[in-house]
Regions:
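N-terminal small/polar-rich segments of proteins
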Residues: 2-138, 182-215
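C-terminal structured domain segments
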Residues: 138-196
């Protein structure tokens, strides 16, 4: 019988073990027979599939694009960028062939915006080009940068063979493996005179889909 305290140590993934039993006529006697039992278990934890941000633990991260005003070289311009550490937990011990990831902004109309770009908006609420700062996103998957166009799904192949990261997720006591997927956000250089001075804000929405055909 497996005690509940031992069961609690099993995290999502594939587990295997071998039990060997030897039959003797008495403790000091020779072996009469040997029995071997192979165990192969797949533990799933779909309800805890999670997009995890290690630096923010269990809170929604607040991302600063670090946009700076640069007077030189002339004419003055603004640009910026930042990185966001992210790890994807599939609830299956990363035993699946792929994950699908989609990143989008809050979907406001942005006429004239370059294809694939995401946006933040001036706090005053304007909708013109001068009230919008655009940025691009790339996702590093196994050392390969993948461009994450706005509301376009990227399929991350080879989840079951890629390098994994051991983390303790919020609400869990045992470490699990997740897929490192850090993001790089880049605000390209634009003329400072083309944008309103002040505070810009917006939302970045990240969605992860786990294939339904897995165990």
């Amino acid at each position: 019988m497996l005690e509940s305290s031992e069961l609690a140590k099993l995290v999502a993934g594939r587990w295997d073990a071998t039990l060997e039993m030897t039959l003797r006529s008495h403790p000091a006697g020779g072996e009469l027979a040997t029995y071997k039992f192979a165990f192969d278990l797949t533990i799933t934890d779909r309800d805890r599939a999670n997009i995890y941000f290690p630096a923010s633990d269990n809170i929604t991260p607040l991302v600063n694009l670090n946009v700076a005003y640069l007077p030189v070289p002339s004419p003055p311009h603004v640009e910026g960028g930042t990185s966001l550490d992210m790890c994807l937990y599939d609830g299956l011990g990363s035993q699946i062939p792929y994950l699908e990831v989609t990143i989008r902004d809050d979907g406001k109309d942005a006429p004239g915006r370059a294809p694939g770009m995401h946006s933040v908006w001036h706090h005053a609420g304007g909708r013109g080009d001068d009230s919008r700062l655009d940025y691009s996103i790339t996702l590093d998957y196994g050392g390969v940068p993948l461009k994450m166009d706005n509301n376009v799904t990227q399929r991350l192949l080879g989840i079951d063979t890629t390098q994994l990261r051991l983390v303790v997720l919020p609400g869990m006591s045992q470490p699990v493996y997740c897929v490192p997927a850090p993001l790089k956000l880049t605000v390209p250089r634009v003329l400072a005179s083309s944008k309103l001075a002040g505070y810009y804000e917006g939302r970045m929405i990240i969605e992860m889909v786990v294939p339904s055909s897995t165990p």
